[in-house]
């Protein structure tokens, strides 16, 4: 039996094209979008303001396309990791992180990743497939705690800018008035920085941007992150200086602090020099040990000194709380290999 096409993940423009093709009235596109993204139905039969005739017409070749997680793991700190099926024999993980006043979902954009960052388990897994907009949105749509969500971060498996078409479609659905109607301020997209994709993302999306930095020294960053060789951090910073980050959109840099590698005041000074003139902030991240990697994380005292030095020199810096390490859900630990 031929599988049906998912409606979930379609933008309003795509839904308008669909209803026109099926001979349905134009206003049906917004009705379908409302059922999908506002009322969050799981079947076409629930779309009761569409006539029975049109529901049956849709059902011939289409379905909502919602897929529940097939596995969950719960951390002692309340973090929950979910496993979603995506296509044949592929899976991705997403992580729900509840906090006092906010609840964040960390979602994936690819099965595996091509970037091969030295410190990341997803990179060790290698790349298998891009996620479709439907598979990206489904991580939110089918989340059991969906109604508690306040923020989404695209910091799970994969490099979002390496799957930019589908990522931009998903962001359009999340922020569009026809879709989830979220403020872009509730969404952060993280990237190693791909030249072509970065420029397009900044120009086509108002969501927050987080750059994986991890070293201000080109040679060292290239060793940690091969993507540095294609588009250096110094070139990236020069590109970013062409845009205004002082208003709605926030620009941040992620910096894993490794013991004896990038944790001294010398590196803090290099960071200040590199980022001078950019309206941005730094998030310091504790390294979470992964199998087969000899790197170690700096201790909290070292991270605190590093943060305080940057902050006193005018660069707003925070230490990100580590969550879900006991279930391999913390930063850099996601893998479905």
Language-model regions, residue ranges each:
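Ferredoxin-type iron-sulfur electron-transfer modules in oxidoreductases and energy-metabolism complexes
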Residues: 134, 138-146
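Short linear Ser/Thr-Pro motifs
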Residues: 75, 108-109, 190, 212
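Canonical Radical SAM [4Fe-4S] cluster-binding loop centered on the CxxxCxxC motif
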Residues: 98-135
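P-loop NTP-binding catalytic core
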Residues: 88-97, 101-102
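Auxiliary Fe-S-binding modules of radical SAM enzymes
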Residues: 1-92, 241-250, 257-337
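Conserved AdoMet/S-adenosylmethionine-binding subsite of the radical SAM
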Residues: 144-151, 156-320
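Generic beta-strand structural signal
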Residues: 80, 92, 103-107, 115, ...
């Amino acid at each position: 039996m031929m599988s049906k096409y998912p409606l979930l993940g379609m933008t309003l423009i795509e839904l308008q094209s669909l209803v026109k093709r099926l001979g349905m009235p134009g206003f049906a596109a917004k009705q379908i979008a409302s059922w999908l993204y506002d009322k969050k139905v799981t079947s076409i039969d629930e779309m009761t303001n569409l006539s029975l005739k049109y529901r049956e017409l849709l059902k011939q070749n289409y379905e909502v396309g919602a897929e529940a997680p097939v596995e969950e793991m719960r951390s002692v700190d309340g973090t929950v990791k979910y496993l979603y099926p995506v296509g044949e024999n592929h899976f991705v993980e997403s992580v729900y992180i509840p906090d006092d006043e906010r609840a964040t979902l960390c979602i994936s954009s690819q099965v595996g990743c091509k970037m091969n960052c030295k410190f990341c388990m997803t990179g060790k897994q290698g790349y298998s497939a891009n996620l479709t907009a439907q598979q990206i949105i489904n991580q939110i749509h089918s989340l059991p705690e969906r109604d508690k969500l306040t923020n989404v971060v695209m910091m799970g498996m994969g490099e979002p800018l390496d799957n930019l078409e589908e990522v931009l479609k998903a962001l359009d659905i999340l922020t569009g008035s026809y879709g989830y109607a979220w403020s872009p301020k509730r969404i952060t997209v993280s990237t190693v920085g791909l030249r072509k994709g970065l420029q397009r993302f900044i120009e086509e999306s108002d969501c927050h941007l987080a750059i994986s930095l991890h070293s201000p020294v080109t040679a060292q960053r290239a060793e940690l992150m091969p993507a540095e060789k294609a588009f250096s951090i110094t070139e990236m910073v020069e590109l970013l200086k062409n845009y205004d980050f002082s208003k709605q959109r926030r620009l941040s840099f992620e910096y894993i602090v490794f013991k004896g590698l990038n944790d001294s005041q010398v590196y803090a000074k290099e960071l200040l020099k590199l980022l001078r003139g950019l309206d941005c902030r730094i998030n310091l991240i504790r390294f979470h040990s992964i199998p087969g990697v000899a790197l170690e994380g700096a201790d909290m005292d070292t991270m605190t000194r590093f943060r305080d030095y940057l902050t006193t020199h005018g660069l707003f810096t925070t230490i990100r709380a580590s969550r879900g390490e006991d279930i391999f859900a913390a930063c850099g630990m996601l893998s479905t290999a």
